[in-house]
């Protein structure tokens, strides 16, 4: 079904970053917003569907049969069936925060491999990369990708307060640079 046909209806499309609010809560040091079993179920679905649909992170929208969701946009700039870099990084960190480090790190590595090694452009801030090729589709100056700097914080299972506190990783990095 095209996106317009879904208005007012439920969709069974699995969104790659359906737990964005969970990531925000973890970064802010807040309690989980959803029951742990719901979070684990959603992460399992994202790994089984969205991660399996590409070698370059997570496809943004995947049907229960594993097909990339076609939102009906012409050309390649259909965000639903490709990889949204910033959103994928947040999803990777959500896996990290919820005890699935191997999966979270693999998602982040897939994205970084596409950006830094495949396209040799690690500092370009791409928005959307192609799910089949890992090559850029859209966005050369997209700042949500700066979320990558929060990856060490998520890998350490820390919130922003503890990560930036005296003696924390940021403090240690600054001290080492001095």
Question: PLM features: residue spans?
Answer:
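Active-site core of glycosidic bond-cleaving carbohydrate-active enzymes
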Residues: 2-176
């Amino acid at each position: 079904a095209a996106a317009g046909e879904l208005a007012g209806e439920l969709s069974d499309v699995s969104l790659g970053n359906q737990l964005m609010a969970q990531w925000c809560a973890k970064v802010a040091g807040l309690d989980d917003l959803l029951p742990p079993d719901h979070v684990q179920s959603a992460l399992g679905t994202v790994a089984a569907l969205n991660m399996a649909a590409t070698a370059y992170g997570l496809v943004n929208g995947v049907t229960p049969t594993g097909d990339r969701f076609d939102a009906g946009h012409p050309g390649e700039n259909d965000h639903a069936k490709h990889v949204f870099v910033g959103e994928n990084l947040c999803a990777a960190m959500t896996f990290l925060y919820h005890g699935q480090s191997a999966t979270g790190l693999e998602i982040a590595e897939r994205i970084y491999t596409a950006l830094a090694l495949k396209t040799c452009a690690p500092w370009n801030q791409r928005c959307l990369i192609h799910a089949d090729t890992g090559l850029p589709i859209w966005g050369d100056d997209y700042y949500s990708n700066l979320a990558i700097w929060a990856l060490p914080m998520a890998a350490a299972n820390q919130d922003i307060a503890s990560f930036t506190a005296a003696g924390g990783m940021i403090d240690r990095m600054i001290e080492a640079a001095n």
